[in-house]
Swiss-Prot record:
It holds the Pfam family YchJ_M-like. Belongs to the UPF0225 family. Residues 1-22 are annotated as: Disordered. Transmembrane segments: none annotated. Disulfide bonds: none annotated. This is UPF0225 protein SAV_6631.
Amino acid sequence: MSKSRRTRSTSRPTSRPQPASCPCGLPEVYEACCGRFHSGAADAPTAALLMRSRYCAFVRRDEAYLLRTWHPRTRPAEVDFDPRMRWTGLEILGTTEGSAFHSAGTVTFRASYRGGALQERSRFERIGGAWVYVDGEFFE
């Protein structure tokens, strides 16, 4: 009586890697979250979402988006990215106004980076219906 040899496949089904969630901290993939704002497909409907999308733009070093969403009155000629800076998280601490029904608003946030964090209260205004960053005040 001969024994037949069975060979067992040791390969596992290949699964596609899951897309990473957006750097802004919301549980959506970048393309469905801040990516749509960065590409120009949509405008951020609130000051808080603009803040998140700008944080994400700093993470991705998207200078064009940052300049496009900066108030013309306070916009710098260029964004000075620190090549050593590694952003690690964003926490929205509070907002005042800044909804689709307002023309101005503030967002207070903590942005963490490798080695520390910064806290800022940012001011936003609407120009032609689109939210733009005006300026911010750092605090501890």
